[in-house]
Amino acid sequence: MKTTTEMQLVPISKLVPYVNNARTHSPEQITKLCSSLQEFGFINPAIIDRDFNVIVGHGRILAAKEEDIQEVPCVFANHLTEAQKKAYIIANNRMAMDAGWDEEFLRVEIESLQGTDFDSLLYPYHFTRYS
């Protein structure tokens, strides 16, 4: 197992989206990602290879472009083969879809945010469901 530790800010103009990325990003999702960037900043790095090809983070990068962010944090995964990159792109997206929610913990966390400065428009489904 190899752990990647190299991270740096990379100009968005250098990043190359994976042309065969099977994951799509709706305008609504990009809007939510833009709101997240405004609220929290770009704190979840993209994963790229040595040639600046994007492996993970396509949606966040699209949102960063919308927000006119010039550089984004990127982790370099230079140890992956071409086949591993393709497999990781699919696996990373699929694993997120397979996750679930502990509804009780979610309700408690959302209730604890009521009355704070937190922008509830970021996740309207969850907030309206539990408000």
Stretches found by the model and what they are:
Residues M1-S131:
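Aromatic/glycine/proline-enriched transmembrane-helix motif characteristic
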